[in-house]
């Protein structure tokens, strides 16, 4: 990929070269390109991979069926795991064994909720939800940076309020936040944003969702690696927003 990009005069940035991923800059727009891969060993956080040539194996190592589609240069879609039907049904479903996919990288628990909040409709996939609950203890293995990045993406989705409510019922928020969460307050914040014409803001929504107790809030800021500005913004919103 690097060689062909150079031959075509396309800027290539080695954003994740150790994982086979580079970013190509075309007319000012970034496009991630990743070599086909197979999992060699998984650690519950990130996998050790080998590069390959098999599109089916590359698809089967991914998290959700809707993430495993591929398309040829002439527009033919290849679907090895039923992703096209799941897209049509607005359904987020793990590939193969949900428990095994989660054990490969526990961040997939958060991705399950984010993808449903962004692209899903109706009830969560029951098998996937049960596997997330069973594997929730693995969330403690994740770095704060990865949790923060994924949760910030989740909090600004169209279905964030419902997803967070289900996460709370499943016992995930206590692990992630380190204290009691207030999903109903997130509902209120989203309504307030809509009324005032404000764009979704992850820090503002986190403030509505999270903690009154200062010690808990400080642990959250440390655990999630919030910047000083983000931590101060979260705290200022907490004390202004009615619960």
Regions found by a protein language model. Give the residues of each.
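Catalytic cores of the polymerase beta-like nucleotidyltransferase superfamily
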Residues: 1-243
